[in-house]
Structures are given as structure tokens and as C-alpha cells.
């Protein structure tokens, strides 16, 4: 069970979370910078989370007063339709295509979040494409044409690629053993304050 003060913390609307998510990667000032940490919750102590990162490091994160929490849940590859707005972490291929490492399908309320193509930190040399699915082909796996303002990418999605979507969440999801992606402000002394947290629902490890 989450600590009572944590459970009472106000969570912003789902759309407000999407607006915050769109700012990932922007600098937060000279004294602070935006950080993203993939981790497992070890303990919840009031407004603090004790985490073990995927690289094995220990980290304590404090929660901002307006921390936004969202759940990540699995969906099927077949749920990606023409016109879907998606994000996709991928690896560049020699032929210029992108091979998907994961795909996250945005709810309509989050359409436009982070639109574009850029480097990503899931793996060395990985990329992130957020855009609208145009052409969609293939019966074993899928090949997607994803368009965004100023460009497009052809993304090959193998049949075993994890596909997820977002649901509104609450701090009640922040429990020991939950897998999370924490985004927030980190100061030069290593202190981190979480402003938004994505939580894998029912033990899911967020693939992004």
C-alpha cells in the first residue's frame, strides 16, 4: 500500500501530463537539467521513492507537488492503425529504414506529443520518431510510414516488438517492485525531483 501522504497527492489531468511530456529533453536552466531514469521502485517513504536503476545504481527521488503519473499498458500490434499517432524507439538500418525496438500508441488526447525525429537514449545510436501512421503494410510484423512536420520515416516493426499505450494513473501505482520511467529535474549535486512518472501496470516493464 502507498504511504498515505503520497496517496493524497494531487495529480494533474491526463492532458496536462501530455503537455509536460512534450517538453522532455529541454534544458531546465543552468542549475538544473531534465533527466530520465528507468528504474524499479524499491521503497516508498512519504514523498520519496527509493529506486534501483536498470544499470543497478541506487537513487532516491523526491516527488514534485504536482507530479503527474501515467500508466503504461500493453496493446496489440494490430491496434496500430492508419492515422494513429505513435512514438517509436528504433535502430537505424543500412537501407535508411528504422527497425522498431518498441512502439507506444498515444491516446487521441495526446496527439502531437513530442512530434518529430531525434536521437534517443534507449540504446546507443537509437532514435525516437513521434508522428502519424500513413501507409501500413505487412502481415508478419508491419512496415509503417510515419510522418511528422518536416519529414517522415519508414519503420519496420518485427512481430515480437512490444507495443503499449497510456492510461491515466495516480500515485497509488507507485508501489515497491513497480517498473517506472521517472522524468524530472536533476541538480549538479545529483538530487532529482520527479515531475512525471510512467508506471508499467501489473508488473509491465516500460519498453521505452
Which sequence ranges carry the predicted segments?
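Short, flexible, surface-exposed loop segments at domain boundaries
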Residues: 2-6, 17, 22-208
Amino acid at each position: 500500500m502507498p504511504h498515505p501522504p503520497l496517496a493524497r497527492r494531487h495529480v494533474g489531468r491526463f492532458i496536462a501530463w501530455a503537455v509536460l511530456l512534450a517538453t522532455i529533453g529541454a534544458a531546465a536552466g543552468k542549475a538544473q537539467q531534465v533527466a530520465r531514469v528507468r528504474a524499479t521502485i524499491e521503497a516508498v517513504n512519504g514523498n520519496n521513492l527509493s529506486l534501483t536503476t536498470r544499470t543497478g545504481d541506487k537513487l532516491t527521488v523526491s516527488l514534485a507537488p504536482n507530479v503527474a503519473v501515467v500508466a503504461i499498458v500493453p496493446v496489440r500490434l494490430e491496434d496500430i492503425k492508419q492515422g494513429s499517432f505513435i512514438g517509436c524507439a528504433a535502430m537505424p538500418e543500412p537501407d535508411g529504414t528504422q527497425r522498431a525496438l518498441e512502439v507506444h500508441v498515444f491516446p487521441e488526447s495526446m496527439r502531437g506529443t513530442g512530434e518529430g525525429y531525434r536521437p534517443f537514449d534507449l540504446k546507443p545510436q537509437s532514435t525516437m520518431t513521434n508522428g502519424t501512421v500513413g501507409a501500413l503494410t505487412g502481415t508478419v510484423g508491419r512496415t509503417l510510414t510515419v510522418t511528422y512536420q518536416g519529414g517522415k520515416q519508414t519503420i519496420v516493426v518485427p512481430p515480437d516488438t512490444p507495443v503499449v499505450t497510456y492510461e491515466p494513473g495516480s500515485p497509488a501505482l507507485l508501489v515497491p517492485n513497480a517498473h517506472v520511467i521517472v522524468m524530472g529535474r536533476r541538480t549538479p549535486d545529483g538530487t532529482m525531483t520527479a515531475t512525471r512518472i510512467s508506471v508499467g501496470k501489473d508488473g509491465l516493464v516500460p519498453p521505452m
